[in-house]
Amino acid sequence: MFTLVNRKSGVARGALGLALLLMASVASAHEHSRCVVDDRDREVCLHNAARRIATLSPGATELTYAAGAGDQVVAVVSYSDYPPEAKQVASVGSHTRIDLEKLVGLAPDLVIGWVTGNPAEQLETLEALGMPVFYIEPRDVEGVASTIERLARLAGTETAGQAVADNFRTTMAAIEERYRDRESIPTFYQVWDEPLMSVNDQHLIGQVVEICGGENVFGEQARLVPRIDDEAVLAANPEAIVAGGMGEENRHWLTHWEQYPNLTAVAEDN
């Protein structure tokens, strides 16, 4: 049986066929893309696994290496010293001031940005230049594990990344269980010296302090990274002081407190 098709219906059927073809093509392309949602709730998609990654914070560098993508990192920023191999990667400035010309010259196909650490206009400029930017801001243990998994997805290192993420979850759960029934130790975590800064309980570090049996003495502060002074620390009188930052380079952060022998952490050599 033959069906007669007039010109208008033929055009309509042709348009429908084209639309279906386009939809199938889009669906197929999306299916083969590497898509993940970043910590600004944006979907970031790459057609192929990233091969030239720029990490714009020391934390982003460490997490990208943890995801098994260290060999794909072509640019880092100041203080990206872990793992040690990261020190051999080209530096493109600090997390607050990127050498844009140098970064562009390295031709990254993926940039890992820090939501609250990198200036927004800096990352927006990179996006305007056509660089995909994946924003990270892990706030808890699960956030760290999830970030590793998502970075691994973008880098094509899913197997390695999943193993690290699972091990991290297991390790942190074991630590939490170990200290669960012990009395908490009032702890001051120092993230910077000038100005003197700590973290509150909403910060990842604050949560890790708690998991490890500490009680963050500045946990109730409104700001994620509050500025404080010596008087505030003396008033809080922590039993332990922990300094983050640059390893042995900031040893003086701890020796600074030795001038206060009545501070419990100093008296007990904690």
Where are the regions a protein language model picked out?
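Bacterial N-terminal signal peptides that target proteins for export
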Residues: 2-16
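Bacterial N-terminal signal peptides
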Residues: 14-25
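Extracytoplasmic substrate-binding proteins
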Residues: 30-36, 42-46, 109-110, 114, ...
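Short helix-initiation/N-cap motifs at beta->coil->alpha
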Residues: 39-41, 92-101, 117, 221-230
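A short, structured surface patch at a secondary-structure boundary
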Residues: 51-106, 110-116, 217, 245, ...
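His/Asp/Glu-enriched short active-site or ligand-binding loop at hydrolase and phosphoryl-transfer sites
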Residues: 77, 202-225, 245
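Structured C-terminal subdomain patch of bacterial secreted/periplasmic proteins
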Residues: 98, 143-153, 162, 182, ...
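Short helices/loops that flank or line small-molecule/ion binding pockets
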Residues: 100-107, 129, 228-237
